[in-house]
């Protein structure tokens, strides 16, 4: 195990009865990496991502996050989750709260920030994504692209060390998806550690430091975007890329 790994995954297995959604997955994520995970439906990509903060509890294996074994039942997972932002396909904003309250709730409750401090940080982040004028709107008054940009900056309000993205643009049309990808590219350039399950190959080529291809619960191939897309090593990966590019 590298000493500079932010997350180390060892022999991760997730079974649902006879089905192995994850089949002995091992990898390391270093600070500042932008790791894009691709693969066909049912390959285990989202299960892997959701296992990293124990939204899916692995059947066996180990996840070390910032030196702590978070698969140990004695560990306070909520403490570690505060350092792992998560952005979902369906935004998961609280519908009954304004955008500003969506963004300040967790920092005030969990990080014990004052209302003024939490609101100042939220407004600064809203400005970064061009949505400061929507602070007092409710989620139902926003477009899908706006909601997802809010979901990203809401995650940033908690000052996480890594953000996990589970198909963040798959519920959006290409134009709205483009708005979200622009925010993610800027975030990648800022040095944020990001792990992203996506079908957006253009984003993977442009912003990823590493691309991982998963199939049947295993990591089949991983490489830099340049090597991965121009010179895939396995037939399975070649066939997948040929079918989508």
Predicted features and spans:
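ABC family nucleotide-binding domain
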Residues: 4-225
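C-terminal boundary and immediately downstream tail of ABC-type ATPase nucleotide-binding domains
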Residues: 213-216, 222, 226-245
């Amino acid at each position: 195990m590298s000493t500079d790994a932010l997350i180390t995954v060892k022999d991760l297995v997730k079974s649902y009865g006879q089905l192995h959604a994850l089949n002995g997955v091992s990898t390391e994520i270093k600070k500042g990496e932008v790791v894009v995970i691709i693969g066909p439906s049912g390959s285990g990509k989202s299960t892997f991502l959701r296992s990293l903060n124990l939204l899916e509890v692995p059947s066996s294996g180990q996840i070390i996050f910032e030196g702590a074994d978070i698969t140990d039942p004695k560990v306070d997972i909520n403490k570690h989750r505060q350092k792992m932002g998560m952005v979902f396909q369906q935004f998961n904003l609280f519908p009954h709260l304004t955008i500003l309250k969506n963004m300040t709730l967790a920092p005030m409750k969990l990080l014990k920030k004052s209302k003024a401090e939490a609101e100042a940080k939220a407004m600064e982040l809203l400005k970064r994504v061009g949505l400061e004028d929507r602070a007092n709107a409710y989620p139902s008054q926003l477009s899908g692209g706006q909601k997802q940009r809010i979901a990203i900056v809401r995650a940033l309000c908690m000052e996480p060390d890594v953000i996990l993205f589970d198909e963040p643009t798959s519920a959006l049309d290409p134009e709205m998806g483009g708005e979200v990808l622009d925010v993610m590219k800027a975030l990648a350039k800022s040095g944020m550690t990001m792990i992203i399950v996506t079908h957006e190959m253009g984003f993977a080529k442009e912003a990823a430091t590493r691309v991982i291809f998963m199939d049947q619960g295993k990591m089949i191939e991983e490489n830099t975007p340049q090597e991965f897309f121009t010179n895939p090593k396995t037939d399975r990966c070649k066939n997948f890329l040929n079918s989508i590019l």
